C-alpha cells in the first residue's frame, strides 16, 4: 500500500505546501455557515472540510454538486461556499463556480490540485478577479480510475489548514497492522475470508465519517460491492436487522477513534458471534484521526482487491457501459431548465 499511495512523497508535499490563504478562508468568521461540495473522488474531502469546520465552532454541511446547484441564488448567498475538485474541469463544479462567483463572490472559494490549462474553475476565478482560488502548484499526485492519492493529499492539506502545528511525519510510512479482521467471537480472519461478501455496513462515529464515505466510493466504483454508511446510533436504531438477516454474505466495518471505544464494545455485545468484522482503528482524537482512518481503510481496500482479483486501476465493465455516456447526461442543462428548488406550488416543468 505504501508504494501505491506514495505516502512519503504525499506527506512531504503536504507539509511543505503553503495553505495560509485556505486557512484564512476556513477559520475566519466561523459564525458564517459553510457549504462544501466535491465532485467525484473529492466528495469525501468536502465531507472532511465540513467536519473540521464544525469542530472549529462553525456550522457546516457537505452536499453533492448536483444538490448545491439545485439551490437558489438567494440560498447560495447565505453561506461560504467551498468547491473541491482535483482538476477543476467537471461541468458540475465549473457550473457551481460560475454561479457562486456571480451571486456570492466574496465568500466563494475553490480548492483544486491541478493548475494546468484544463482547470476551468481556476480560469473562472481569474476572470472574476477573485483571490479565493486556492491552488497549490507543483503537487505530484497520481490517480487511476479510482482516486487513491488525491483524497490522502486533500485530507493532509485540510489538517494543516485547521491546525498549522500538526505533525504529519508519522504518516510517511504505512502502519504495520492497518486493520483487524475477525469474527465477533474473536476468531481471526484474513482478507480471503471476505471474498464472498456481497454488502458491507460501515459504522462510524466522530472522525470516521469522511473515511467511511471514501471507502464506500472505492468499493462501488471498483465494482466490488455496495456499502451502507451509518453512524453507530442509526445502526443501533434498527438497521442491525440487515446484519442479522445476512450473516452469510455481509460484513460490518467499524471506524473507531478513542471516542467510540465504549460504543464499539457495547455494539459488539449484541452482534451474533459469527458476524465478520473489519476493525479500522486510530489512537488519535484530533483532525488527523480522519487521515489515519483514510490510510488504514485504503489498505483494506487494496488487500480486498488483491484477493478478489479486482483491478482497481481499470475496473472490469462486463455490462460494456460506454464510460463516456454517463458524463454526457445533461445534469446542468436540466437544472437550468427546471430552475432551483422552491416551495411554490404553482410551478410546472
Pin down the residues of each PLM region:
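A short, well-structured juxtamembrane/interface segment
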Residues: 13-31, 179-196
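Internal, active-site/partner-interface "lid" segment
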Residues: 139, 158-192, 314-348
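Short, hydrophobic/amphipathic alpha-helical patches that form generic packing surfaces
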Residues: 153-161, 217, 221, 291-306
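Anionic-ligand anchoring segments at beta-strand to alpha-helix junctions in alpha/beta enzyme folds, i.e.
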Residues: 21-79, 194-245, 299-302
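Short, flexible loop segments at the rims of nucleotide/cofactor-binding pockets, characterized by
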Residues: 10-17, 58-62, 87, 176-183, ...
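Glycine-rich phosphate-binding loops that contact phosphosugars or nucleotide phosphates
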Residues: 27-178, 246-283
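Phosphate-moiety recognition in structured ligand-binding domains
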Residues: 2-8, 128, 250-251, 256-262, ...
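Cofactor-/ligand-binding subdomain signature composed of acidic, glycine-rich
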Residues: 1-29, 144, 149-152, 159-167, ...
